[in-house]
C-alpha cells in the first residue's frame, strides 16, 4: 500500500531523513515512534509530499508520487488525509461547514455533501454538534471534527501527526478508540506518529522506531517480546516501570552489599505464575517486593517488579540464573545500604 524507498531529506545541509525504507500494508494501523527531532513529522509529510524528499520514491497504491505532475499529485492527495496536533478548524464556520470544506473544494454537489456529513457525524459522535462553532467545542470534540473532515473525501490513507499530544489522557483514549473504529469500519490505512509508547500499544499492529533520521527497527507488536535487544521492547519497559522514589534511591550504594535491589520484567505466561514465592522457597531467601506494575500490550500481559533481596553474591547469581531460565529480564539497580531503607 505505502512503500518508501531510499528516502533522504535534508534541511540546511543537515539530514532529517537518512535512507528510509519502509513498507506499510493496506488496512493496517502503523505507528512511528521516536523522540523529538528524530524525523517522525518529516517522514509523515514526505508520504503525501508536503515535504518533497531530496531522493527516493514514495509509492502509494502502486503510484510513485515523486514522478507525478503537479496536477496528478493534487489528484493523488485526495486519497491521503491528514490530522494534526492542532485542529486547524475555521472558527467562523460551523461543524457542518468545516467538514464540508474539502468536498466543496473538490466541487462535490451539496446533496452529496449533506449525505456524507450525515454519515460521518454519528461515527465521530457529534450528531448534536452539527451547527456548533469551534469555540463551543472541547479539545476532543474539535479533534473529532478534524477527523470527520479528513474522512469526508473517502481517503485510503489517514496520516496522524501527534494527533493526541494536545489532549488529556481520557480524551486521548477516546480519540484512539475512534481511530481504531474508523480503521475497522472503513479499512483505512492509518500511519500514526508519536513519542508515546502508550499510544502505539493501544491501536497499532506494527511500528517503526526512529532515531536521528533513521529507522532502526520495524516490528510487529506481537514480536517485541521475542527480541531481547529490541529498542521498542526497552521503550515499553521504560513506560511501565514505576519510577524509584527518592527515599529509595538515596539509600542505594554502587558497591555490593547483601541487599541487592533488582528490577524484573515479565511477559506472557511468566507474568501470571507465582515466580517470586516459588523462588523464595527454593533458594531459601527473602524477597521484598517494593514496587510493581502490570499492563497489557497487544494481548500480551507484561509486568515489572522492583524487589529487595537478602542475598550474598552467590545467592544473587543463583537468583539471576533462575530468572533468565524463566525468561524474565533482570536488572540490578544497586545495593541497599546496610542500615536499611
Swiss-Prot record:
Record-annotated ABC transporter domain positions: 2-237
Annotated membrane topology: Peripheral membrane protein
Catalytic activity: L-methionine(out) + ATP + H2O = L-methionine(in) + ADP + phosphate + H(+); D-methionine(out) + ATP + H2O = D-methionine(in) + ADP + phosphate + H(+)
The enzyme's E.C. designation: 7.4.2.11
Enzyme class: translocase
Binding site for ATP: 34-41
Keywords of this entry: Amino-acid transport, ATP-binding, Cell inner membrane, Cell membrane, Membrane, Nucleotide-binding, Translocase, Transport
Main location, first listed in the record: membrane
GO MF annotation terms: ABC-type D-methionine transporter activity; ATP binding; ATP hydrolysis activity
Keyword Cell membrane set for record: yes
Keyword ATP-binding attributed: yes
Membrane-spanning parts: none
Record's GO cellular component terms: plasma membrane
Compartment list: Cell inner membrane
Purpose: Part of the ABC transporter complex MetNIQ involved in methionine import. Responsible for energy coupling to the transport system.
Subunit structure as annotated in this protein's UniProt entry: The complex is composed of two ATP-binding proteins (MetN), two transmembrane proteins (MetI) and a solute-binding protein (MetQ).
Family label: Belongs to the ABC transporter superfamily. Methionine importer (TC 3.A.1.24) family.
Name of the featured protein: Methionine import ATP-binding protein MetN
Source species: Legionella pneumophila (strain Lens)
Amino acid at each position: 500500500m505505502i512503500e518508501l524507498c531510499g528516502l533522504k531529506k535534508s534541511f540546511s545541509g543537515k539530514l532529517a531523513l537518512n535512507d528510509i525504507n519502509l513498507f506499510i500494508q493496506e488496512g493496517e494501523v502503523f505507528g512511528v515512534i521516536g523522540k523529538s527531532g528524530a524525523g517522525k513529522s518529516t517522514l509523515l509529510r514526505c508520504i503525501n509530499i508536503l515535504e518533497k524528499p531530496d531522493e527516493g520514491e514514495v509509492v502509494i497504491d502502486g503510484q510513485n508520487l515523486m514522478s507525478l505532475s503537479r496536477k496528478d499529485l493534487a489528484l493523488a492527495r485526495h486519497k491521503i488525509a491528514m490530522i494534526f496536533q492542532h485542529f486547524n478548524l475555521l472558527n467562523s464556520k460551523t461543524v457542518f461547514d468545516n467538514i464540508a470544506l474539502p468536498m466543496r473544494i473538490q466541487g462535490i454537489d451539496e446533496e452529496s455533501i449533506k449525505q456524507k456529513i450525515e454519515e460521518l457525524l454519528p461515527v465521530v459522535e457529534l450528531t448534536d454538534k452539527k451547527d456548533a462553532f469551534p469555540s463551543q467545542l472541547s479539545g476532543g470534540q474539535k479533534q473529532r471534527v478534524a477527523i470527520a473532515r479528513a474522512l469526508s473525501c473517502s481517503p485510503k490513507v489517514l496520516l496522524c501527526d501527534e494527533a493526541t499530544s494536545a489532549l488529556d489522557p481520557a480524551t486521548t483514549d477516546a480519540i484512539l478508540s475512534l481511530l481504531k473504529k474508523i480503521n475497522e469500519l472503513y479499512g483505512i490505512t492509518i500511519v500514526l506518529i508519536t513519542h508515546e509508547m502508550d499510544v502505539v500499544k493501544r491501536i497499532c499492529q506494527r511500528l517503526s522506531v526512529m532515531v536521528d533520521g533513521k529507522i532502526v527497527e520495524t516490528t510487529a507488536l506481537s514480536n517485541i517480546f521475542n527480541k531481547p535487544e529490541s529498542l521498542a521492547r526497552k521503550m515499553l519497559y521504560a513506560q511501565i516501570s514505576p519510577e524509584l522514589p527518592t527515599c529509595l534511591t538515596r539509600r542505594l550504594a554502587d558497591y555490593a552489599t547483601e541487599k541487592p535491589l533488582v528490577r524484573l520484567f515479565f511477559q506472557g505466561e511468566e507474568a501470571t505464575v507465582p515466580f517470586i514465592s516459588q523462588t523464595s522457597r527454593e533458594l531459601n531467601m527473602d524477597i521484598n517486593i517494593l514496587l510493581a506494575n502490570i499492563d497489557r500490550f497487544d494481548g500480551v500481559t507484561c509486568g515489572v517488579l522492583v524487589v529487595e533481596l537478602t542475598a550474598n553474591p552467590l545467592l544473587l547469581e543463583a537468583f539471576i540464573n533462575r530468572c533468565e531460565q524463566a525468561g524474565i529480564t533482570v536488572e540490578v539497580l544497586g545495593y541497599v545500604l546496610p542500615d536499611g531503607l
